[in-house]
Structure formats: C-alpha cells, structure tokens
C-alpha cells in the first residue's frame, strides 16, 4: 500500500510530457495506483479483521496508509478502512472511465493475449491491469462486504448492462464453453475481469503439489482433492451437467477422490492453453452476477426476486446447467445459500469462498463437520 501511495503522489504532479501517451498514460497510472491502494487495503482488512456482520464495533485492526512517506500508522476500525477503500475506488473509477470505456474492443483476447509492440505495449493487456471494469467490480464487492446492498447492486448493474451490450465478459456462453475447456480454457478466462500474470509459478506449484507422484499406483499418489461425499453435497443433482465438475475435476482413487485440474498446465499449442497457464483470476463477471443477485433479492417483491434469480441463472446456464431448481428457496437466506453453493464450485482455488463465508458470518464445514 505504501508503494502505491508513492506512485500516485508522483503521478499526480508529473509532467504529462514525460509519458509516451502524455496525459492519458499519466491518468491511467494515477487511477490504477489509487485503485490498487484500495484493493490491497481491502484484502488485508478481509484477512485480518472481522467482517461487519461480526460486529467489530470500535476495535482497530489495520492502518489505512494514504500518505507517502509513511513510517508509523495507527490501526483503524473496519468502518474507517471500508470508507477509505470506497472513496479510493470511486476516485479510481472516475479517472479510468474515459480511458477504458473509450476502447472499442475489450474482449478476452485483447485483455489477456494480444501483445502490442513498442511503446504502446504499456497500455495493452488491460486484463492484467486494474482497469475501469475491474475497479467497478471490486467496488461492488466492497459495498456488499460493507452491507451496502443498494450501492453494491448499482455498481454490479453497470457491468451487467455493459456485458449485455458488448459480451466482453462472457459468463453465460454455454453454447461453446465445453469446447473451450477441451481446448485449454480451464480457467474460463473470457469471464475474468482482472487477473494477475504468472508466467510459470502457478502451474509449477500445481505440478509439485498435485502431480509429482503421478507415476505411482493410485493408492500411493498424493494430491489435493475433494472427496466424493463433499462433491455430492456441493453439486447435488446438477453434478453431471455442470462444466465445472465435468472438466475442472478428475476422478481419482476409484471415484472416492476428485483432483482439481484448474491449475494443471495446459498444452500451450491449444487455442487457449498458453493464456490459461499464465492467469491468476482475481475477480470474475460471475461474481458480479452473484453480487447483483444477493443485493437485489427482496422478500415479498416478486419482480426483484425474479431479477435476482435471472442473475444466478446467467452463471449456472453458462456452466451447462439449463434448468435451475428453486424448490428449496422460501426466503432470502435460502437464496443466498444457493449463491454460496454455486460460488464454491466457481471459486475453488481462487481464494474468494472463504471471504464469502466470513462476510455472511457462516460456519465453515468439511466432511467431518464444522471447522473451528
């Protein structure tokens, strides 16, 4: 966070003539630095402080560093940090709006694959940078975490409306998703709004953790896995149709265990293999639909309930589930549980499910029961 404050303070006063693309590039750096400051503080807050749902009150947990140089900073309350993160994200959003929305093409290949030669390379591959759409998605995430449902919905709706016009962040393209998986699109990167770039580290880690003993007998292999019992509980009757089960998991040990393939190194000669090997997902369009669904669902309001269901169905249908069963839903809590259930399939290995449980003050469980 301190480094980001340093970057933005320099960008604020720098002469635009120093930059290849002059003031556009200066503003891009400034907007990204402000957004990254909020992003990193928010993740630290989620990690080290209780969620608002746990009533942290006036206790203090982490500082919010917005000045450089800064040597010693007082810890602040959860509400203080959230207020400052929201303010930073709104300012970042304002600065980046013209830069990214004026682009005529923000499709997945432009975001993550197509490199640009020369000085223009700095402004390319915006999916690996904190672009306007990513800032908007993160602002929706922060608002929901803060319990500000109306504001969370408003930000999510901006992206949903954009997606309906441009199809930049395809969360619902079920007619080609299965072929994408087969051609190396294991992380569904077209759905990712913002990612980190990792040339080999992530696939190397997966190789060491999950595939080092592949040559041994089934009973002697070591890997991270889901149990069949856990999978049945999470996927239920949708299991056989869900692309995330069919393509992102591999049956092991006679069907008792299932190993994740999300980070398995893809063949780079396939259509999507190289891009998927390098991507670490940070926020997806599917999460934006989850946010909108949870935020708009209002008990007793049939129109809002129908709208909320349509957002969840966008994600599910894009994952091969053509019919969604709502027979277990009689309250908002039931509906939120459905969202959480789908998010567990969507986000495994991405670090978001834990914070969803924390935000909702839900108990974590495993095969043997509750996790302390």
Predicted segment positions?
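Acidic/polar-rich alpha-helix caps and helix-coil junctions
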Residues: 3-210, 235-372
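Short, cationic low-complexity segments
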Residues: 214-232
């Amino acid at each position: 966070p301190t480094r980001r404050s340093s970057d933005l303070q320099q960008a604020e006063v720098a002469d635009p003539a120093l930059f290849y693309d002059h003031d556009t590039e200066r503003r891009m750096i400034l907007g990204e630095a402000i957004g990254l400051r909020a992003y990193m503080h928010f993740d630290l807050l989620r990690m080290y402080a209780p969620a608002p749902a746990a009533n942290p009150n006036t206790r203090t947990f982490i500082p919010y560093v917005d000045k450089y140089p800064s040597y010693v900073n007082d810890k602040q309350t959860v509400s203080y940090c959230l207020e400052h993160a929201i303010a930073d994200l709104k300012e970042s959003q304002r600065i980046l709006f013209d830069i990214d929305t004026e682009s005529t093409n923000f499709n997945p290949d432009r975001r993550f694959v197509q490199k640009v030669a020369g000085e223009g390379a700095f402004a390319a591959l915006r999916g690996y940078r904190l672009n306007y759409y990513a800032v908007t998605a993160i602002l929706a995430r922060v608002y929901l975490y803060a319990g500000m449902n109306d504001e969370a919905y408003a930000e999510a709706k901006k992206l949903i409306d954009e997606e309906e016009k441009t199809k930049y962040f395809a969360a619902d393209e079920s007619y080609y998703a299965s072929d994408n998986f087969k051609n190396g699109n294991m992380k569904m990167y077209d759905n990712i709004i913002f990612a980190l770039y990792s040339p080999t580290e992530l696939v190397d880690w997966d190789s060491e953790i999950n595939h080092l003993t592949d040559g041994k007998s089934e009973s002697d292999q070591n890997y991270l896995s889901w149990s069949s019992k856990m999978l049945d509980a999470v996927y239920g009757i949708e299991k056989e149709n869900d692309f995330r089960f069919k393509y992102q998991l591999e049956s092991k040990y006679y069907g008792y265990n299932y190993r994740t393939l999300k980070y398995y190194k893809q063949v780079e000669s396939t259509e999507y293999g190289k891009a998927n090997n390098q991507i670490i997902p940070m926020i997806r369009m599917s999460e934006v639909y989850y946010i909108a669904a949870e935020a708009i669902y209002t008990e007793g309001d049939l129109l809002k309930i129908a709208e909320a269901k349509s957002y969840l169905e966008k994600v599910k249908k894009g994952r091969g589930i053509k019919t969604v069963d709502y027979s277990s839903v009689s309250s908002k809590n039931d509906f939120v549980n459905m969202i959480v259930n789908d998010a567990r399939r969507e986000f495994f290995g991405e670090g978001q499910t834990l914070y969803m449980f924390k935000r909702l003050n839900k108990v974590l469980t495993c095969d043997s029961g509750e996790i302390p």
